[in-house]
Every structure is written in C-alpha cells, then in structure tokens.
From Swiss-Prot:
The gene is CPS4. It comes from the Eukaryota. Residues 1-47 form a transit peptide. This is Syn-copalyl diphosphate synthase, chloroplastic. Belongs to the terpene synthase family. It is found in: Plastid, Chloroplast. Its cofactor is Mg(2+). Substrate binds at residues 233, 453. Phytoalexins are diterpenoid secondary metabolites involved in the defense mechanism of the plant and produced in response to attack (by a pathogen, elicitor or UV irradiation). Residues 45-74 are annotated as: Disordered. SUPFAM superfamilies: Terpenoid cyclases/Protein prenyltransferases, Terpenoid synthases. Disruption phenotype: No visible phenotype under normal growth conditions. Mutant plants exhibit increased susceptibility to the rice blast fungus Magnaporthe grisea, and reduced capacity to inhibit germination and growth of lowland weeds in paddy soil, possibly due to decreased levels of momilactones and oryzalexin S. It comes from Oryza sativa subsp. japonica. GO terms for molecular function: magnesium ion binding; syn-copalyl diphosphate synthase activity; terpene synthase activity. Its EC number is 5.5.1.14.
Length: 767
C-alpha cells in the first residue's frame, strides 16, 4: 500500500530514524498509517496542559475492576433502573400539577355555606382536612420549614373557619394561643421572603377574626405596619384597570373591598377561577354564586381529597421545571419520549405574549416564558425571542406586569440563561436581556442579597454563581450536573406564594437519589476507563514524545471527552476522543520540539496505528488523520493555528467511533456539513488566538474583539446544531457543539479550575 507524505519524503517521527530503504513490511493485522507534517505554535483547546499534582495512580483505580466492585455496580444499576422507572411513571401521568395543600386556601373554601340552604359547609371535607392537619405546636402551615408569616396566615384562617362553624373548640384555642404568643415575630420576618399579597390578605383575616370576637393582639406594632402597607398598596391600585383587564390583582381578591363583581366575573379564567387562586375564587363565589366558580372549587376539592392548594392548575410550570430539573440532574436521556410530550404541550400553548404557569391564564410572566423559550430552543422548536419584549420597559426587565417590587433573583437567573441561546438575526432583545440580567445578578451577588421572593431553595447563590462564571458556550454537561447535585434541594425546596408550598413532581428526593446513583455509575465507568487509558498510554510509550505534563494531559483529554459524552453506551466515542487527542498532542509536541515537519525524515505509521479502529472505518480514520497532518504542513509557513484542524479531527474521530461517519464524497448534506466544520474550525482558531493574546499581555480591547467574533460564530453554530439540517444526525450535529464547547471551556478556565472540576466530576464520590 502506498504511503502518503505531505512533502513526498519519508519522515522521522519522535527521533526514530527510518528511511525508505529501512522501512519494514507491515505485519499481518498491522494497519498502515500516515506520515505527515504539521506545526502548532502552542497547545490550546483540549490540549491545554494543567499544572496540578498528579491524579490517583493506576493501582488506586484498579480496585474498580475487582469482581466485588462489579457486583456492587450491578446492584447500583438495578437500583437506579427502579428509580428511573418510578420517575417515568410519574411523568407519564402528569396532569394539571402536583402541589402541596394550603391550609389558608382550604379554610376560605371551608367558609362557603351549603348551596341548598342547610346548615354547615358546602365542602365538609375541607373541615376534615383542617382538623386532621393541625401541627403539634397548635399552628397550621408548612410542617418542615418554619416561616412566621406562613404559620400566622394559615393558623388564623383555620381558626376563623372552625370558629365560624362553632366546632373543635380545643383546636381553636390551641391555634389562638400560637397566634397570641407569636404575632410579634412578624416584625422580624425576612423581607425578601414576604408571602404574595400578605399585606392585603392578613388584614382581611383579622377583620373576620374581630367579627368573631377572637382574642388576638390586634394592637401589635407589627400589625399596625401591615395595615399601613395595605392602605398604601390599595390606594395605588387603579380601579379601572382592576375591573377591566386581567392582572395579578385577581389573585388576591379576598383581601380587597368595594369590588364590582359583575365586571370582575368577565375576567375569570376559562376554568372558572380567578387567576387560578382557590381563595380568590372562593370569595368570588361567596359574593356572586357563580356556577363556573363553583365548578372550579368543587373540582379541586375532590382532586385533593378535601384540601386545596394555594394555586391551581400549574400544568405549564410543572412541565417546564420538571424538564429543567431532569436535564440539569443529568438524567434526561432516560425520559426522551416523556420530555418530548412535555415540550410538545408547551409548544402548543406558546403564545406571542409568552407563557404563564397554566395554559388558560392570560397573565404571562417572564419566568415561565424564559424557561419555555430556553427549553424549546434547546430541543429544536421554533420560537421567537421577541416575546421577551413584553417584559421590558425603560431598559429593564420585570417578571410580571405591574409588580410593585423590583425584579427577583430566580426570574432574572432563568432569563439570563435563556438570553445566551442567540441565533444570528435574532432581535436585540436577547442581548439586552443578557446585559440587564447579568448586571442585576452581579449586583445581588456582590451585595450578598441572593434570597429570592419566589423560592427558598438549597443553594440559589451556587446556581447563579455557576451561570455567571460559566456561560452556556463554556458549560459542559457533567460539570453542571456534578455541581447541581450539591445545589438541588429535592423535597427540601420550598416555593413562596400566598403561603409556602411544595411542587412534588420536580422537587422530590427520588429525582435526587436517581441522579446521584446515575452519576455514581458514571464515575465508576470513568475510573475503569481511565485505568485502561493509562495502561494504553504507558504501553504505547507516548510520554517520551514530549509534552509538559503527559499524565495531566491524559487526564484532561479524557475529562473533556467524558464531560460531554457521558452515556454508558458511548464509551467508544469518548475513549476515541481521548486517544486521538493524546496522539494529536504527541505529534504536535514532537513537531514543536524539532522545529516543524520540515525537519522530520520518517513516517508516522507506528504512532497512528496506536488508535484502534474497526476495518469498516479504517478508511475514514486514515483520511481524518491525513487531512490533519497535511494541515500541519500547509500552516507551518503561515504561522496559523492548527487548533481548528485539531477540532475537526476530534469531531471526525468521534463520529467514526460512534459509527456515524460518512465519507465526504458520499454525503447528501455536504454543504451543511461543511458549514459545521468551517464554523467549528474558525471558532477554535479564534479561541487559540484569544489564549495567546492573554498570555502575551495584549490589550483588553483585543481580547474582547476576539470574544465578539467567537460569540457571533457561536450563534451560527448553535442555530445549525439545534435547528439545522435534519438530514444530519442530531448526535452528529451535537458532536460539533461538544468539541467547540470543550475548547471554549479550556480557553476561559484556568488550569487550576480544570483540575478542580476533574477531581469533582470523576474522583469525588457523590454523597
């Protein structure tokens, strides 16, 4: 078989002299490879050398191959499968929203009298729920998270309901005692965690308590401040707007007076509710006897077996957050069809005005809209970013129209994440949103004001920190997942509405346990694969061919591959990525050491034959190496970076080992594919220049100019990957994105950061 050489001469590789006459015939089974010339100025991208101490030695990782470990791994996989099946069952039965019961809303529904004129409540099961759910200290409210506002609101409402029907005096007395002893604590509540409409609803409850002669410290200074705030807010409410168009004010009608119910009834949601609030709807029914309001209340009382939530339904919100949590926890691949069903539902209900928590609510918000935009765009749906203009005013972005408080952390965090998914030609609103949200979050982060008015989650500061420090273009899936496993609170996360509530479908411990087990399986596979990769590396004697820290280069190369391609059935792809990266680094190190391929005198077949490949793909792999090595020679004289060609080599190798590679001449989608290659090469070359510019102390303006160029090309690559040619396999398109994002990650991260991520992702056990 003829041997290819870029200069039509034999080359010495790594100081192993050989001439054409000295060339030995290939042994049976040995595959011939290419000898080419290339030059790379400095390592960049996946070849960046880290300077940390060595990672665990091969003896330490061999324990993962012991029979007992394999048995443990099998048990863990079986347990993981069981949990995954449980999550899948829940997703397939997803409906209008699974949410905890609100004692406050249940009590207001319990006040409704029988429709037939008889004595007693229309919904006696609500009374049963109240009686059965008093807490040991005499209060009602969230049992696991103590917030005084939540406990006072819930307890006072339950006492009012029981006293109104003159039943369960003992429970009323215990509830009153709790209120009497704790009302003063309202003055010390966390301002950022104020319940929705608290200053409107609590005075209304207190007025009802007065009418029932309940012994409550009405002159408590904390209550005087709340009454004053109520008057201030009610005075600001434009009555004509309240009665003429849907607003968030409809969510708190139970706290308002002098309402024109005939006008308000025209503003009901299609399901008969007022802004999906049982308490507000119960008040409306009490005042009007409207049949649609009754049907809404009757339906939720039956669904929740006597108790009612503080808001319902939440069909859009629940689907969006479930998909987001599953994705960030790294287990979304197990629920492909279920996620598709969820997002199809979201897309069907997408509107030019955005999204609300439910499809029938006319009052849209930026939180649901931004999350919906981001997920739909990520999964290939066509959505217009101009929808975010609905939440922009005077250069600022807000969550809800007419909100009285400044924007809060989580809505701006979700909008910031969404704003990074830009395509060429998109309206400038995404750029403006990114700038505003980043500034807002930086300000909150810098002043340590990270409490959110909508959620009390385990580690919101950590989530925001990751998003700020690692933009989407440089965020690798396994890094995000490993960190999110420590940030996700599971069943401990609480949401703030009129009262505290919990979203049990996507905030639960089953998600967390399944994700941790899944990640533990991944870590064990990584350690086994790394052990094998080390042995291959030592057996191949690659260390002698150069490199500042070959062992760390090995670790970094494998880490970048596994941080992107982590599925158990794709081991060949990540190992192919790692081996090709190591070989390319060895060739490049050697050529840099000897002054370029022009000073080489022998062939490269010994080195290239170290890459194992199936005969079916040998031609493709040879061609990939040939083109990369030719690029060395072509770019040697021009001093151009070889990083773009290295990125293409990695893409082609991954596709070859994944069994998806098609020879160039056989591609029906040649133009689209070549565009992906050109963008990938160009971006990675620019990232190399960025690294060099920083190392050489060039101006900040120069680095920013390169960043802008990278961002523009990244937008085009993102569009082509997420919504590009359907003739190109989705996995193939994603391969380009994986490789480019790995180059971005290395370009933007210090070696110390990369080392810490390697340790965290692969070696620190998930607890």
């Amino acid at each position: 078989m003829p041997v290819f050489t870029a200069s039509f001469q034999c080359v010495t590789l790594f100081g192993q002299p050989a001439s054409a006459a000295d060339a030995q015939p290939l042994l049976q089974g040995q595959r011939p490879f290419l000898h080419l010339h290339a030059r790379r100025r400095r390592p960049c991208g996946p070849m960046l050398i880290s300077k940390s101490p060595p990672y665990p030695a091969s003896e330490e990782t061999r324990e993962w191959e012991a029979d007992g470990q394999h048995e443990h791994t099998d048990e863990l996989r079986e347990t993981t499968t069981t949990m995954i099946d449980g999550i899948r069952t829940a997703l397939r039965s997803i409906g209008e929203g699974e949410i905890s019961i609100s004692a406050y809303d249940t009590s207001l529904v319990a006040l409704l009298k029988r429709l037939d004129g008889g004595d007693g409540p229309q919904f006696p099961s609500t009374i049963d729920w109240i009686v059965q759910n008093q807490l040991p200290d005499g209060s009602w409210g969230d049992a696991s998270f103590f917030m005084m506002g939540d406990r006072i609101m819930s307890t006072l409402a339950c006492v009012v309901a029981l006293k109104s029907w003159n039943i369960h005096t003992d429970k009323c007395e215990r509830g009153l005692l709790f209120i009497q002893e704790n009302m003063w604590r309202l003055a010390h509540e966390e301002e950022d965690w104020m319940l929705v409409g608290f200053e409107i609803a609590l005075p209304s409850l207190l007025d009802m308590a007065k009418d029932l002669d309940l012994d409550i410290p009405y002159d408590e200074p904390a209550l005087k401040a709340i009454y004053a705030e109520r008057e201030r807010k009610l005075a600001k409410i434009p009555r004509d707007v309240l009665h003429s168009m849907p607003t968030t004010l409809l969510h708190s009608l139970e706290g308002m007076v002098d309402l024109d119910w005939e006008k308000l009834l025209k503003l009901r949601c299609l399901d008969g509710s007022f802004h999906c609030s049982p308490a507000s709807t119960a008040t409306a029914f009490q005042q009007t006897g409207d049949q649609k309001c009754f049907e809404y209340l009757d339906g939720i009382v039956k669904k929740f077996n006597g108790g009612v939530p503080c808001i319902y339904p939440l069909d859009v919100y629940e689907r969006l957050w479930a998909v987001d949590r599953l994705t960030r926890l790294g287990i979304s691949r197990h629920f492909t069809s279920e996620i598709e069903d969820c997002l199809d539902y979201i897309f069907r209900n997408w509107t030019p005005d955005g999204l609300a928590h439910t499809k029938n609510c006319p009052v849209k918000d930026i939180d649901d809209t931004a999350m919906g935009f981001r997920l739909l765009r990520l999964y290939g749906y066509q959505v217009d970013p101009c929808v975010l203009k609905k939440f922009e005013k005077d250069g600022k972005f807000f969550c809800l129209h007419g909100e009285s408080n400044p924007s809060s952390v989580t809505p701006m965090y979700n909008t910031y994440r969404a704003s990074q998914l830009k395509f060429p030609g998109d309206d400038g609103v995404l750029g403006r949103a990114e700038v505003f949200c980043r500034s807002f979050l930086q300000d909150r982060r810098g002043s340590n004001r990270m409490k959110d008015k909508w959620a009390i989650a385990k580690d919101i500061p950590g989530e925001v920190e990751y998003a700020m420090d690692y933009p989407w273009k440089a965020s690798l899936p396994r890094i995000e997942t490993r960190l999110y496993l420590d940030q996700y609170g599971g069943s401990g996360d609480v949401w703030i509405g009129k009262v505290l509530h919990r979203m049990t479908l996507f905030c639960n411990d089953l998600y967390l346990k399944a994700a941790k087990a899944d990640f533990s399986n991944f870590q064990k596979e990584c350690r086994v694969e790394l052990n094998g990769l080390r042995r291959w590396y030592l057996r191949s004697n690659l260390e002698k061919f150069g490199g500042t820290d070959p062992q760390t280069t090995l670790m970094t190369s494998y880490f970048l591959a596994s941080a992107n391609i982590f599925e158990a059935n794709r081991a060949a792809e990540r190992l192919g990525w790692a081996r090709v990266a190591l070989l390319a680094d060895a060739v490049s190190s050697h050529f840099r050491r000897i002054g370029g391929p022009k000073n080489s005198t022998s062939n490269l077949e010994e080195l290239i034959s170290l890459v194992p490949f199936d005969d079916a793909y040998s031609g493709s792999l040879r061609e990939a190496w040939k083109q990369w090595l030719m690029a060395w020679t072509a770019k040697e004289s021009s001093q151009e970076s070889i990083e773009g060609d290295t990125a293409i080599l990695l893409v082609r190798a991954i596709e070859i080992f994944g069994g998806r590679h098609v020879l160039t001449g056989q591609r029906p989608d040649l133009w689209e594919y070549s565009q992906l290659e050109q963008l990938t090469s160009s971006i990675c070359c620019k990232l190399s220049r960025r690294v060099l510019a920083q190392e050489n102390g060039e101006s900040t303006e120069k680095v920013e100019e390169i960043d802008q160029q990278v961002d523009l090309e990244m937008q085009e690559l993102t569009r082509r990957v997420l919504q590009g040619c359907s003739a190109i396999n989705r996995l193939t398109r994603e391969t380009f994105l994986h490789v480019v994002k790995s180059f971005c990650y290395v370009a933007y991260c210090s070696p110390e950061t990369i080392d810490s991520h390697i340790d965290k992702v692969i070696f620190q056990d998930v607890i």
